[in-house]
Amino acid sequence: MARIAGVDIPRDKRVVISLTYVFGIGRTTAEKILTEAGISSETRVRDLTEDELGRIRDVIDRIKVEGDLRREVSLNIKRLMEIGSYRGLRHRRGLPVRGQNSKNNARTRKGPRRTVANKKK
């Protein structure tokens, strides 16, 4: 397994697919990385030379990925919560942030149901 940006990427897959195992790199970014490094997207990871791996690493070093990206996202969310914006309040309460309906659904964000017991009449 080749190691790129602290992630072991699978050897038997094509390079484009393997690069998506790194947090912050999707298909489009992977294509751009390979174009910039001058490597065919059809190549398998096991067929890459050390020189090609080095070129891929150099290109990825200029992009925010893995820990740096996770840290930036969490700091952005923390900032929203501190300034008291609507989005920050939704994050703090564990509710959907992007305007989704939360009357009946949103169970993923709200967690399991907490049932309230009825009073006897």
Swiss-Prot record:
Gene: rpsM
Annotated GO biological process: translation
InterPro entries, sorted: Rbsml_uS13_C, Ribosomal_uS13, Ribosomal_uS13-like_H2TH, Ribosomal_uS13_bac-type, Ribosomal_uS13_CS
Any one Pfam family match given in the protein's UniProt record, by short name: Ribosomal_S13
A Gene Ontology molecular function term of the record: rRNA binding
Family the entry assigns: Belongs to the universal ribosomal protein uS13 family.
Keywords associated with the record: Ribonucleoprotein, Ribosomal protein, RNA-binding, rRNA-binding, tRNA-binding
Protein name: Small ribosomal subunit protein uS13
